């Protein structure tokens, strides 16, 4: 657990969470002096949080550990509109039943990070005030504080103008700003936290409170979880890396972190574990074969936070058992691949590297469930590699290869 610094701002800064802040000096001062109620919103687009939400949950957890009160806001109302930020198309519309089911699932996962006992944190759902909103009153009360010109200049809308932005989605920013307004009135919430892709929406909430009520309001964004090449982390051969063990097993989850790029280890240890920063820096400074020890620590710590100590230990032991008989991934023969290989079928790459003699040999292995990548069976004979499908390739029972990018 992080040693108690006087101010959580310094902890967040040192660990690399902070990206953009509305009033940096004021925020640092109030976080050091007051108990702040803050919120982060989660739209229920699926019945599980994924690794992209993980960093926001850690952001909340650090704030709570330093005496501040989190509100985890489930978007049961905004989820019916869909956030256009970072999207080139319109989200599929979900039914009320789907949204409510997803909200319940997400609430359970949040309790792994946040202590909701004795009013230490609040679980709220914006469906409570958005679904039965009086449209005319809302327009008169809130709409007058928004400039359409300024809204259209926001990055989240600008990128959508060419492909078409629906009026439904155009309302999202105002709805999110209204959430902040309501949470301020109900719980004296004065700060919003969120991913950096939410910056435009968050500024709207801060400005609404400051204009309408002449009250102090603040926003901080956290960095998005990207690898050393700037690509979003958390994708596997199966798709997203989920926090639900039914969707991504603890073993698969452990393996993902065990096999990340060397350059990403220190950043992930800082953002996704509670290890002291001295230890994070020590592990991050390890080189060559030694960095694998740091990856084991990362995989264990992250899996422990999400799935508990027992599942983390099981995943660690399963990995050691798999590689225990001389099949250690660090010592396994490497298959070095380039960007050019990502457009080829895996079987063609294996024939090129003389790992298998013919494609028909590879097809037979796949048909007999004898080929897996990071413990996931390959079922498609036309399977192609990409940045997120590197790691342990197993052919039959005894052949192991470490697929790495050259």
Swiss-Prot record:
It is found in: Cytoplasm. GO terms for molecular function: ATP binding; RNA binding; tyrosine-tRNA ligase activity. It catalyses: tRNA(Tyr) + L-tyrosine + ATP = L-tyrosyl-tRNA(Tyr) + AMP + diphosphate + H(+). It is an enzyme of class 6 (ligase). Transmembrane segments: none annotated. L-tyrosine binds at residues 39, 172, 176. GO terms for cellular component: cytosol. Keywords: Aminoacyl-tRNA synthetase, ATP-binding, Cytoplasm, Ligase, Nucleotide-binding, Protein biosynthesis, RNA-binding. Its EC number is 6.1.1.1. InterPro entries: aa-tRNA-synth_I_CS (IPR001412), aa-tRNA-synth_Ic (IPR002305), Rossmann-like_a/b/a_fold (IPR014729), S4_RNA-bd_sf (IPR036986), SYY-like_C (IPR054608), Tyr-tRNA-ligase (IPR002307), Tyr-tRNA-ligase_bac-type (IPR024088), Tyr-tRNA-ligase_bac_1 (IPR024107). Residues 344-404 form the S4 RNA-binding domain. A motif ('KMSKS' region) lies at residues 232-236. SUPFAM superfamilies: Alpha-L RNA-binding motif, Nucleotidylyl transferase. The keyword Acyltransferase does not apply. A motif ('HIGH' region) lies at residues 44-53. Belongs to the class-I aminoacyl-tRNA synthetase family. TyrS type 1 subfamily. Catalyzes the attachment of tyrosine to tRNA(Tyr) in a two-step reaction: tyrosine is first activated by ATP to form Tyr-AMP and then transferred to the acceptor end of tRNA(Tyr). Homodimer. This is Tyrosine--tRNA ligase. It comes from Fusobacterium nucleatum subsp. nucleatum (strain ATCC 25586 / DSM 15643 / BCRC 10681 / CIP 101130 / JCM 8532 / KCTC 2640 / LMG 13131 / VPI 4355).
């Amino acid at each position: 657990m992080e040693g108690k610094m006087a101010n959580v701002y310094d902890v967040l800064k040192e660990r690399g969470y902070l990206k953009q802040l509305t009033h940096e000096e004021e925020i640092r001062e109030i976080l050091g002096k007051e108990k702040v109620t803050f919120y982060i919103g989660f739209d229920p687009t699926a019945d599980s949080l994924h690794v992209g939400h993980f960093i926001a949950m850690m952001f909340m957890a650090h704030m709570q550990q330093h005496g501040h009160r989190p509100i985890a806001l489930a978007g049961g109302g905004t989820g019916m509109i869909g956030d256009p930020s970072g999207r080139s198309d319109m989200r599929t519309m979900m039914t009320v039943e789907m949204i409510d089911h997803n909200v319940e699932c997400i609430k359970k996962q949040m309790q792994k990070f946040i202590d909701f006992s004795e009013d230490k944190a609040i679980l709220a759902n914006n469906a409570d005030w958005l679904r039965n909103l009086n449209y005319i009153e809302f327009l008169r009360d809130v709409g007058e504080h928004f400039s359409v010109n300024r809204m259209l200049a926001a990055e989240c809308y600008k990128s959508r103008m060419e492909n078409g932005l629906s009026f439904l989605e155009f309302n999202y920013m105002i709805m999110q700003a209204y959430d902040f307004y309501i949470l301020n009135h109900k719980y004296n919430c004065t700060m919003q936290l969120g991913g950096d892709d939410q910056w435009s929406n968050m500024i709207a909430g801060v400005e609404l409170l400051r204009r309408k009520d002449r009250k102090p309001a603040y926003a901080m964004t956290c960095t998005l979880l990207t690898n050393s090449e700037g690509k979003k982390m958390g994708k596997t051969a199966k798709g997203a890396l989920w926090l639900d063990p039914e969707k991504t097993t603890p073993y698969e989850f452990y393996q993902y972190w065990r096999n990340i790029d060397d350059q990403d280890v220190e950043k992930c240890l800082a953002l996704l574990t509670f290890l002291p920063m001295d230890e994070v820096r020590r592990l991050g400074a390890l080189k060559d074969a030694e960095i694998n020890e740091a990856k084991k620590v990362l995989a264990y710590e992250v899996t422990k936070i999400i799935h508990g100590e027992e599942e983390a230990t099981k995943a660690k032991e399963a990995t050691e058992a798999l590689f225990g008989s001389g099949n250690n991934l660090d010592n396994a023969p490497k298959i070095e691949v380039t960007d050019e290989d990502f457009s080829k079928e895996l079987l063609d790459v294996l024939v090129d590297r003389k790992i298998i003699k013919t494609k028909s040999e590879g097809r037979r292995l796949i048909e007999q469930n004898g080929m897996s990548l990071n413990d996931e069976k390959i079922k498609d004979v036309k399977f192609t590699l990409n940045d997120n499908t590197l790691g342990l390739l197993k052919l039959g029972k005894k052949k192991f290869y470490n697929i790495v990018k050259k």
